[in-house]
Amino acid sequence: MDDRPAAATAASDRLARGPAGDRLADYARMLRRAGAIADDAGERAFATVPRHRFLTRFRHQRWHEMPCDGPVPEEILDAVYGDNPLAFKIDEDSGQLVSATTRPSLLARILGALELSPGMRVLEIGAGIGYNAALIQAVTGAEVVSLDVQPDVIADAEEALRRCGVDGVVTVVGDGYDGHPARGPYDRILASCGIRGVPPAWVEQLAPGGFVLAPFAHGGAHPLVRFRLERGRLRATGVGPWTDFMLAGGALYQPFLGAHPARFAAGPFPEPTLSRQAVAPMTGEDYGDLWFFLAARSTRVTQAHVGGIDPADA
């Protein structure tokens, strides 16, 4: 039996119709087989919310333009319904990446970590293309508030949501640091960007029993962390996986979040102190744990990658 609210069921069924319906079903099954989706509600959401309809232009190996009408080329559907993050906004002057979609398998794990159920109210910090909010709304059937500091991002997300017939998402232009108290309290607050600390406003806008889920940026690593208010104190629990989200802008941004802000000449470095110990090889996840541990204890910790040095010569 489908236990979604009627509004969510109708919206999802409407979104699923169309030539890409089989693609959506295969896409959802792929994510579930990979262990990224853990329950039927999540699989239904990914099988009914059309990711390609939220994109007008994206980069995967090269730039692609999404057709406004008519059939969508197979090459585009292959890119969109593979497990690929897709760049969709580049700074015209610098050529630097400004915005990109989340890798679907990571997004599915994040939605699972939210522990959503019908009727929950959710605040999303960082609107992206509107796809995340549409997935959340497909699961909860309740209002989702999606907030972003960039007016053009909100305008594009609004247009995509209208295009897909999603009417349960409220989009707001504003600084994520302040949250959005006007439509709170929220059962869940999701940050879709790397943050260094939890703003007090988010804690104040949580409903009883609610929590904040955010990629917590320390030492260049972004573990997914759940923050709950327990006995007047904020308790953090790592729920994984390690992520690589773009850092928040506006008041949420703090410099030195893990990488040196500018390129600098390598050396001369002071004479190192060497300690020779037999230790097991470290995986990428081990290094993430190490950098997070160090940076959580000192804001001075950063990373510098120095080329031309062979550890075997040390």
Residue ranges and their predicted role:
Residues D3, L190, I195-D313:
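Class I SAM-binding transferase module
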Residues R62, A142, Y253-P255:
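Short, charged/polar low-complexity linear motifs in solvent-exposed/disordered segments
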Residues T102-L213, A217-G219, V225:
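Conserved nucleotide-cofactor-binding alpha/beta core module
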